[in-house]
Amino acid sequence: MHKIFSLILFLFPIHLVFIKIKNFLYDNNIIDPIKIDTKIISIGNVSLGGAGKTPFTIALSNFLKEKRGFSVGVVTRGYGRRNSHHNFLFNNHSWQDCGDEVIVLTNNLSRSIPVYISSNKILGAKELSSLGCDIVIL
């Protein structure tokens, strides 16, 4: 535990430098931000699996759709899938094609919530935005 804490303490200032550089580049219009014509909610954290991101995504998506009336779409990487295609999930996909997390999502999301599988979350968000989604959850 001590070694991990020491590593974090060492890397944290380096991380801050990169954040400052990134912010400088955006603030001075050296690089342009990516524009997507819908609201984006990014669910994530530093930890790996088991942090509750998938159940929270399901609960939030269903709440926004059913209780608030928003058109919601979900983008997922499809971790563990065998291919690297970018596509919408349809009922005839197996967990090998899309990853087991995606099967959990689609089995628990409202049927009218589209799920886009892609390692390129920008592409997925743009695809869902073009479908008319008010909110895209990453």
Name each region found by the language model.
Residues 1-10, 40-52, 125, 129:
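Charged, low-complexity, helix/coiled-coil-prone segments
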Residues 23-91:
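Walker A (P-loop) phosphate-binding motif
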